[in-house]
Amino acid sequence: EREQLRDQVYDAMAE
């Protein structure tokens, strides 16, 4: 499951 990884990537992009 790479859903968690995508959440982290989104967080980094949001910054």
UniProtKB/Swiss-Prot annotation:
Q: What else is known?
A: On the 2D-gel the determined pI of this unknown protein is: 6.4, its MW is: 48.4 kDa.
Kindly provide the name given to this protein in its UniProt entry: Unknown protein from spot 688 of 2D-PAGE of etiolated coleoptile
- Provenance organism: Zea mays
Which lineage?
Eukaryota, Viridiplantae, Streptophyta, Embryophyta, Tracheophyta
